[in-house]
Amino acid sequence: MKICKACSSCMVRTYVDGNIIFRCSCGESVQGDSQNLLVSSKVYHTGEMEDKYKIFIKNAPFDPTNCQIKKDCPNCHLDYLTQICIGSQKIIILVCRCGYTSNRG
């Protein structure tokens, strides 16, 4: 994970011509390196994983290691949301302490 130097938001990992590029919603981009490689694996018990994701999403706003972005919650108007990335498709989810969730991807 990379943090944008321009706006302090989390950058999203993308792949361009086999290269890792981190892009931010503000337009900034940074070249990745070998430290940013992702190892994937096959998930066999999808029902169990859905339950684990629910718990992960619910607890995400309270984990200080997760990325926080400056975006107001439409529910409680808190001035930041927690950004997490889940699943093999790397779906970006925005979560608030009040329980609000948004699938950005």
Swiss-Prot record:
GO MF entries: zinc ion binding
UniProt-annotated binding residues for Zn(2+) 1: C4, C7, C24, C26
Swiss-Prot/TrEMBL keywords: DNA-directed RNA polymerase, Early protein, Host cytoplasm, Metal-binding, Transcription, Viral transcription, Zinc, Zinc-finger
Subcellular localization(s) per the UniProt record: Host cytoplasm
Recorded superkingdom: Viruses
Record has Transcription as a keyword: yes
Predominant place of localization: host cell
A GO CC term attached to the entry: DNA-directed RNA polymerase complex
Binding site for Zn(2+) 2: C73, C76, C96
Function: Component of the DNA-directed RNA polymerase (RNAP) that catalyzes the transcription in the cytoplasm of viral DNA into RNA using the four ribonucleoside triphosphates as substrates.
Subunit structure: Part of the viral DNA-directed RNA polymerase that consists of 8 polII-like subunits (RPB1, RPB2, RPB3, RPB5, RPB6, RPB7, RPB9, RPB10), a capping enzyme and a termination factor.
Protein name: DNA-directed RNA polymerase RPB9 homolog
Record organism: African swine fever virus (isolate Tick/Malawi/Lil 20-1/1983) (ASFV)
